[in-house]
Amino acid sequence: MIKSTVVYRDDGLPLCSSVDDDISDLSLNEQKKRIKMVVSRMTPQSANEATLESKDSEIHYIRQQGVIYFVICEAGYPRNLAFSYLNDVAVEFQHSYSNELSKPTIRPYAFASFDTFLQRTKKAYSDKKVQDNLDQLNQELVGVKQIMSKNIEDLLYRGDSLEKMDDMSNSLKISSKKYRKSAQKINFDLLISQYAPIVMVAFFFVFLFWWVFLR
């Protein structure tokens, strides 16, 4: 289950965050504090994607074009699905705001309206069909280590550096090519889940217009 999404600029400025977080989840604020600490310690040499493990949750992140996208998930939520979600978020965020990201006048959480997309995408990634397809993909890739893992306690409190994960990221890039085609199918299923109702409504009105005025 996806619990929360946070987007930072790589200089530490928070850009947006999901707003439907479970207020009864006492650990969520602690996880967000840890994300803030991770952002403050990142350098240009730090890994561009990784998983940070912490108790009953996992924090996944990707860094693209000066922006860092974090998602907090329940432990055991499929990592491939979490990273596919992050990539979808990154593509849409860059498409929507790329011309504004470098402006020095941007205020914290300036793109709060992006939450609408976050909620729609989060719902799509809860679709059972998508998760089933991912399980099948994982079975085909048994033995392939795809995402780096790092205990967040080691990372934040024992002095380990994010730069140490950089070598592992190179092997990640190589192995990721092996499942790209299967991931594309998953993304197609996500699009169907998100937009099929809209297409059906539009088709109904087109048919109604044809029936009334053109038939």
UniProtKB/Swiss-Prot annotation:
Residues 1-193 are cytoplasmic. Its main location: membrane. GO terms for biological process: endoplasmic reticulum to Golgi vesicle-mediated transport; intracellular protein transport; retrograde vesicle-mediated transport, Golgi to endoplasmic reticulum; vesicle fusion with Golgi apparatus. This is Protein transport protein SEC22. Residues 6-118 form the Longin domain. GO terms for molecular function: SNAP receptor activity. It is found in: Membrane; Endoplasmic reticulum membrane; Golgi apparatus membrane. Belongs to the synaptobrevin family. It comes from the Eukaryota. Pfam families: Longin (PF13774), Synaptobrevin (PF00957). Signal peptide: none annotated.
